[in-house]
From Swiss-Prot:
Chain's role: Catalyzes the phosphorylation of methylthioribose into methylthioribose-1-phosphate.
Family, similarity comment: Belongs to the methylthioribose kinase family.
A Gene Ontology BP annotation from the UniProt entry: L-methionine salvage from methylthioadenosine
Organism of provenance: Bacillus cereus (strain ATCC 10987 / NRS 248)
Metabolic or biological pathway, per its Swiss-Prot or TrEMBL entry: Amino-acid biosynthesis; L-methionine biosynthesis via salvage pathway; S-methyl-5-thio-alpha-D-ribose 1-phosphate from S-methyl-5'-thioadenosine (hydrolase route): step 2/2
Official protein name in the record: Methylthioribose kinase
UniProt-annotated binding residues for substrate: 225, 332
Length: 393
């Protein structure tokens, strides 16, 4: 029959035909997706529920003028299964995948909340940083040359060649926000700050270097889009979803994106409400380093993991990349395509513009920062300098 886009009615038919519900069951279905690329249906018969996710052959956020390969659904399904191999507690269960229809049937996580929404609403997730730090350390280590035999790693690199989605990252994270491109989207009040950003040659040179790292460093399997909208949370659970951007890339990319989105949420808050975000930023890195170190010592397969001086160099290189990638994400989410609600939903216009100017300034400072001795406190330090340094609406 070939590919066709599901509707709520045909999603129910699909689920029944594949044995997820009895033929006579009274199944309710709602399209719940709020993302930019896919349909997401929740199906429930009162006793059990599932999620059906279908990739569209174009970007939903733009329309059919932006075609995309539906093979990204297969990449997402395979990535979730690899994540589950190493950290099953932190990803949803994949029930099945239909490559022809680009349909994946996965566990319903309705008991949890999208982390971005929860943070905006002031909810607290005490285990978020522990879970994300451990998730990233395990996935990145075990899919890298340090935890995987080189021939197996090269095979995985081929599995996760993801040209359409990587091109989106190349353009929307590293290129378009730093110049005159039609995809950019920002308020007129930001024009002066944007002009200053676009004319900063030092900044552009640094961004070029980070883009080149993304293009060329095939260090480990990365999620590729790990923002707080790609995570479900509760006070006791964390589940990473939507790895359709998965590819082999730099160790520090996912960490940088995650931390940047915590910073964006911090910018939307009053000063007395920000400490929990910096707790999560610092603890994410701490849990990542501790877990990665234990795996390096106990599970390393590469000969030079036995050299004690090698690991600190690797971790410092990762941290340098985390800082720069976080800066790129801050700028992209402020003036590029696909904003975040953390900033866009600030009700007071003056405060919203001020927060966005601060995001641009902080992003520039992170990208341009150079020090071989920096530690995770850098994010708190530069943030405080930004919000107290006179960046006004």
């Amino acid at each position: 029959m070939g590919y066709y886009a599901l509707t709520e009615t045909t999603a129910i038919q699909y689920a029944k035909e594949h044995g997820y519900f009895e033929k006579k069951a009274n199944v309710f279905c709602h399209e719940i997706g709020d993302g930019n690329l896919n349909y997401v249906f929740k199906l429930d018969d009162g006793e059990k529920s599932i999620i059906i996710k279908q990739a569209l052959p174009y970007a939903k956020v733009v329309g059919e003028s932006w075609p995309l390969s539906i093979k990204r659904a297969t990449i997402e399904s395979k990535a979730l299964k690899i994540f589950a191999k190493y950290v099953p507690d932190y990803v949803p269960v994949v029930h099945s995948h239909d490559e022809e229809l680009a349909v994946t049937v996965i566990e319903d996580l309705s008991r949890l909340t999208i982390t971005r929404k929860g943070l905006i609403d002031g909810e607290e997730y005490p285990l978020l940083s522990q879970h994300i730090g451990r998730f990233l350390a395990n996935v990145l280590f075990y899919t890298s040359d340090f935890g995987l035999q080189s021939e197996e790693k090269r095979g995985l690199e081929g599995t996760f060649v993801n040209p359409d989605l990587c091109k989106i990252t190349e353009d929307l994270v590293f290129t378009d926000p730093f110049g005159h491109y039609d995809t950019n989207d920002y308020e007129p009040e930001l024009q002066l700050a944007v002009d200053e950003l676009w004319s900063d040659k030092t900044l552009k040179l640094k961004v070029a270097q980070y883009k080149y790292k993304f293009l060329t460093r095939k260090e480990a399997l990365i999620h590729g889009d790990l923002h707080t909208g790609s995570i479900f949370s509760s006070p006791s659970e964390t589940k990473v979803i939507d790895p359709e951007f998965a590819t082999y890339g730099p160790f520090g990319f996912d960490l940088g994106q995650f931390i940047a989105n915590l910073l964006l949420n911090a910018l939307s808050r009053e000063e007395e409400q920000r400490s929990v975000l910096f707790f999560h930023i610092e603890k994410t890195w701490s849990y990542f380093v501790d877990t990665f170190t234990k795996l390096w010592i106990g599970e390393g397969v590469e000969a030079y993991t036995k050299e004690k001086q090698w690991l600190p160099i690797i971790l410092q290189n990762i941290f340098t990349d985390v800082v720069g990638f976080a800066g790129c994400e801050l700028i992209r989410r402020t003036i590029g395509l696909a904003h975040v609600a953390d900033l866009d939903e600030i009700a007071n216009k003056e405060k919203r513009i001020q927060a966005k100017k601060q995001a641009l300034y902080l992003g520039k400072e992170l990208i341009k920062y150079e020090s071989k001795n920096a530690d995770i406190q850098l994010f708190r330090t530069l943030f405080q300098q930004t919000v107290s340094g006179g960046v006004k609406a």
